Amino acid sequence: MNVYFTHSCRCAHSWVQALQAEGFVVKMFEPETLKPARAALHTPASLNGCHVAEFMGYFIEGHAPAVALRRLATEHPAGTGIAMLSPASKAEGGVDGPVVLVDQEGISHAWIGEPQR
């Protein structure tokens, strides 16, 4: 897994540590801007946070938990990536908020949990 974050990002390291504790191998990169990574991964601008990751060809926005990454690895769903829709502080460990799967058209679909109404 590759994680791209900017100098101003204060949360990527804690998310990476949580994933490493779950057995994931993670490389971290600190480019000047995330635009090239996001363009390559086709990340919708509406989901952009302070870091983005690439896992098995999918983009990951937000602090997606290990369970979501394992599900991606097992199911290989049609789509370009997933995004965690809850604040980072709630996303450590289990799934406290919904995770959406983004399709080829950039449309988000409920994937894990239910979006808050």
Where on the chain are the PLM-derived regions?
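Conserved helix-turn-beta segment immediately C-terminal to the redox Cys motif
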Residues: 16-36
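Flexible, glycine-rich phosphate/dinucleotide-binding loops
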Residues: 10, 35, 91
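Local sequence-structure signature of Cys/Sec-based thiol-disulfide redox active-site neighborhoods
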Residues: 1-22
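Stable alpha-helical elements in mature extracytoplasmic
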Residues: 15, 33, 65-69
